Each structure stands twice: as C-alpha cells, then as structure tokens.
Curated annotation (Swiss-Prot):
Example GO biological process: protein folding
Gene Ontology molecular-function annotations: ATP binding; ATP hydrolysis activity; ATP-dependent protein folding chaperone; unfolded protein binding
Protein name stated in the entry: Chaperone protein HtpG
Claim: DNA-binding is one of the keywords in the record: no
UniProt keyword annotations, A-Z: ATP-binding, Chaperone, Cytoplasm, Nucleotide-binding, Stress response
Region (B): 327-545
Organism this protein belongs to: Bacteroides thetaiotaomicron (strain ATCC 29148 / DSM 2079 / JCM 5827 / CCUG 10774 / NCTC 10582 / VPI-5482 / E50)
Role: Molecular chaperone. Has ATPase activity.
Subcellular location: Cytoplasm
Source organism superkingdom: Bacteria
UniProt keyword annotation of Chaperone present: yes
Amino acid sequence: MQKGNIGVTTENIFPIIKKFLYSDHEIFLRELVSNAVDATQKLNTLASIGEFKGELGDLTIHVELGKDTITISDRGIGLTAEEIEKYINQIAFSGANDFLEKYKDDANAIIGHFGLGFYSAFMVAKKVEIITKSYRDEAQAIKWTCDGSPEFTIEEVDKADRGSDIILYIDDDCKEFLEEARVSELLKKYCSFLPVPIAFGKKKEWKDGKQIETTEDNIINDTTPLWTRKPSELSDEDYKSFYTKLYPMSDEPLFWIHLNVDYPFHLTGILYFPKVKSNIELNKNKIQLYCNQVYVTDSVEGIVPDFLTLLHGVIDSPDIPLNVSRSYLQSDSNVKKISTYITKKVSDRLQSIFKNDRKQFEEKWNDLKIFINYGMLTQEDFYEKAQKFALFTDTDNKHYTFEEYQTLIKDNQTDKDGNLIYLYANNKDEQFSYIEAATNKGYNVLLMDGQLDVAMVSMLEQKFEKSRFTRVDSDVIDNLIIKEDKKNETLEGEKQEAITTAFKSQLPKMDKVEFNVMTQALGDNSAPVMITQSEYMRRMKEMANIQAGMSFYGEMPDMFNLVLNSDHKLIKQVLDEEEAACHPEVAPIQTEMNSVSKRRNELKDSQKDKKEEDIPTAEKDELNELDKKWDELKNKKEGIFAGYASNNKVIRQLIDLALLQNNMLKGEALNNFVKRSIELI
C-alpha cells in the first residue's frame, strides 16, 4: 500500500471546496457522471482509430445507491497508477488564492476551472474511493482512497473489468443524496441528454396491484436528443414532442428554429417561440444551456440577447466558457459572435415566415408581438431587420407593416405642419366612442394594447420622421389632427364662467384625480360632455410605471379635461336655465366686481413704473383690500352657481355619463347614477 499527500500548490483544496461551493452541492453528480461519460467516449475514440482492439461491450454508466454510499460506475478507459498520480494526486491549482478572491461571489465558476470536477465529490462525501482498471493490456487494478484530508492511500486490488467505480461515503449532513427521489431528480436535471446511456436502478412495472422491480436497467437519458440530429430527419411532430418533453405543462409552441453551426464556433440547439401569456419577467430563463449534452444552467443572460431570453429551448456549445464570471462572459468574443448569430437566425426565421406565409404570421402576431417589440426596443440591429416584418394592428383587426400603414394614412392623417398623426387606442371597449368619432371622420385607429406598447410608441416617434402618436381620448376629435388654423369658437367669458363653475362644483372627489373644465364648440351631433386626458402627461405616468427614475410623474395626480360641447342642446339648455335662475343674484355681484376690477386696474396702472418703496402705503393697503373684496365676491358668485348646480339633476347626470363612458364611475357614485336615471325616466 502506498500513502501520500495530494499536491496542492497553495492551501488545502478541501476547505476551499466546502467553503465556496456549499450552495451548489448537487453539481457533484453532474461532474462525476460527466467524467464517466468522457472516459467512455475516449474508449470509443480509441477503438475507432484502432488503438483499442478489445470488445467494447455494454458501455452503460451505472449510478447505484447503497446504505451510505453512491457509486458511479463506467466501463471506459480506466486509470493506471501513473495516471492516478498525474490526474488525481497532483492537482494543478496554482494561483488558487487569487482565483478565489476574484470569483468569491461566483461559486460555480470554481468547479471545472482547474480540473476539479472529480473533487466536487468532497462537497458531499466524508470519504471517496476510486477502484479503477485501465483498458491497457496487463494493467493492474488500483484502489485510491481519501477521507477529505490531503492524505490518500493507493493499493492494488482485483477488478475483473476495465473502467472505474467512484464510491462516495456520504456525509451525515448530506443524507438527502441517498434518497432515490433526490438522485433521480438530479440525474434528470443534469444528465437527461448525455451521449452515453445512464442507468439508475431497474425499471418497475405494475403487478398484482403494486410496483415490482424488473431486471431491466432504468435508462434515464436520451443519448441522441433532437438538437444533435439533422433538421432534414425531423418532422414537426418530433419538434413538438421534444418541446412537450422539456416543458410538460406548456401550450404548443408557435414555431421553432434549429441551430447548427460549426464555424467560427460550435453551436447546436433548438429555440422555440412559446405563447407568452403574462408578465415578461416570469417567462424569462427557460432556455437550457448545455455543454456537450451536459446541462449547465438556465440563466443564459450574456449568451442570448435579453429579448430572446423569452424563448424556450436548448443551446449546446463547447465554446462558451461556462466556468467564468458573468462579466467575463459578456466580453468574450465567442459569446458575442454566438449572440449575434442567434439574433440573425431568429430575425431570418421571422422574415421567412412573414414572406412565405403572411397569413400564418398575422394569425400568430399577438403571440409574436412581445418578442419582436422587446427586441426592437432593446437591440438596434434587430430593429433594422424587424421593421420590415413588424406589424401594426388596427381596431378592425387588420394588419399592416410600418411602411404599408404609413401609405394608408398619409393623405388623411397629416396635420397642417406636415406631421403624420398615428391615432391609437389601448382598450377597444372602453374607448369605443372615441374610436367611433375618429373613424367617422375617415381616420384609422391602431390598437396598441400590449405590455410594451407604451415604450414602443415613444421609440417609434423617434424613429419615424415627422410623426406623432396620439391616443384617441387625449383630446376632442377636431384637435387630434389639426389641418388648418381656425378660430376657437367657444362661449363668452361670463357664460363660460357660469357653466364651467356649475359643472366643476358637481365633479366627484377622487383620490389623486383632478379635472379641468372647459367649453368647446364640437357640433350638435357630438356628445354634450367628454373626458379627455393630455397625451403627454398620461404617457409620462405610464412610463413611470415601467421605467426607473420617473417616479416623480407616478406621484402626480391624474389630470383630466371635462369638455362641455357648447353646440349641444343640453348644454345650451343648462346654460339658459342657469342664467335665468341665477341672474337676479349674480347681476349685482357682477356689477360690484366690475367696479372693483376697474379700480384695481387704475391702481396697478398708476404703480406700473414706480419702485416698491415709492408706492404710497395707502395705495398698497387699498389694493390689498380690493384683492380681498374681489376674492370674496368671486367666491360668492361661484357659490350661487354651485347652489344652482346642486339641485340640477341634468348636470350631475351629464357628468356621470361622461365618467361612466371612461370607466370612472364606481361604487356609491354608480349606484346613485342608476337611481337618478330611473327617476329621470
């Protein structure tokens, strides 16, 4: 028996492994099974070139549970005593301290970086044995034993067959890895597509009402997964079946892209376009990254462009440096090339479907839209390609490319300054009356109700020359696309004040909502009262909900305009009745206000060119008294209008109709509206 110390050029390796990899204990199984696969494939290679002339036989790798042990057995090339010394005892770990300091926050980077895959066994084992026999003729079987200290023993043993058995004596605090269900879960996660058969236990079958173990090996992996095969060999059903295998609970994918490139890097895989139903963030990280069919991670940021992390599927590449920090990944030239390649393949595939089967593309647009919009918002080179097949959808559910839509609306929706106005709605039902008003004028209205459409509107305004997007409820229809300068026909000062004050006094109090009441001549066929909201302020508040750094707008109240149509007979009727009812009280107040106003103006004119200190104190005092008097009279007059309005059911009814039309009438206010409507009927 030989004894010795493991050669580590700095500090003991085992505390390092325990300290930095405690959160990733489970990857020991991935590493050990991967090593067994490598040993098996190397034997296959030697046989193919004539260096191994023996019988290959069954090359299945076995994972077996004992009372306190896990054993991974292969019939690969095995190890000689010299190879044990070279690859196990003398660990090339120069610069370990520097490495650990650099990657102390990226624990998974350590495993595999310096050939430490085998030593991951010590994360879960208090003792490890290797019983191995080389494929070479006359090789002596060797048993290597280590208890987690730098000391080891090597002794000759009897072993009939070539290959290696790695026996782990599991630590007391890692007993979960002796549970069949837990090991099965890890093998399924990491080893489902390894290229050599992996057996874990025996298959079971139902017999006499219970499960009975058979003599047949339970093979847990598919050695030739779909992405390793030629696309020409595969049917649509093959792709769909593989998708169901990867994502059992998901709907059928929209379509897929088979990746296969050998130069200047190696990359295979299949990417699926799923149906994204809800929150974007919840749908990320569904792409599985493999290295030579060994599962590595589903966090593919930095390898796949951000917008494509919404896709599902598999990417397999030996050229992605898996065991380094994410910051290094992002600067690696191969990773950048792979990212660019994937983006190009996706855009080419979308362009191909659009060109060859536009009907299918339009049918799937609602599901594709989030991928394409996300890509255009976040990646300029994708935008350049996608602008040729990205679609607008109007409220009649017709689809147009950007160029087609521009041609459609340019004659009728260009304003007096030459700006092309894109009208849109984000809720077809709630904004129906505004959409109808626009379409009655011959305008086309887009439906932009997607998760990313707020951001898309802002981006497209910057991309499109002399263009502006305006929501149909942001103003009255005649102001959405102003085609010529025109005089704003509205009520005279006193009449406007009377009716706007009356309506304003009856507006309900709403949390963080403010109204500005105005009058406008909209024609006798338009609604008597409308609610609009400034495009700019609404858009800023919407952006504040999805973009950091704009919380100021999010805290501001919602500002709405209550527009009274002075041409409508009901508004005229309210105004006439208000004037008749209020005139006796208001007239003397207005006369007094006119007198106060005249004197205020005289004083202000006389003080116009004087310095503050040159104005007599008496004049200052008089002006202050006049201001107070003015406010007092104004409040008194407004009180009269408000008093009249409080007893006028038509005013309250018109306000509630406008609120109801905008989905702003709820609770007690809605109940009162219903009661009042019944009374009026």
